[in-house]
């Protein structure tokens, strides 16, 4: 059995679910997933300049296509910057999947950099 990284497994799962693009702003906690998407033709990452734009684009994608729009952000402020777009999607009942990072388990609940409880 071939060994697969968690990031490649996430990219494969998203592609199998019919996700063709992921909107987001690259951050260190997402590098494994971005690596899993790199070079693939069935799914790609569309980089934005602000996480709120990624959430709004995922919302628009969900409304237009009826298929889940996916947005990704790094932990801490990256995740909180998604809130307006995600709230907008929730209000409109559009299908949106949000993937965010988190601190390493050893740093959880220790007020580590960019931790949100």
In which residue ranges do the predicted regions lie?
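N-terminal alpha/beta PP-like core and its mobile active-site loop of ThDP/TPP-dependent enzymes
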Residues: 1-117
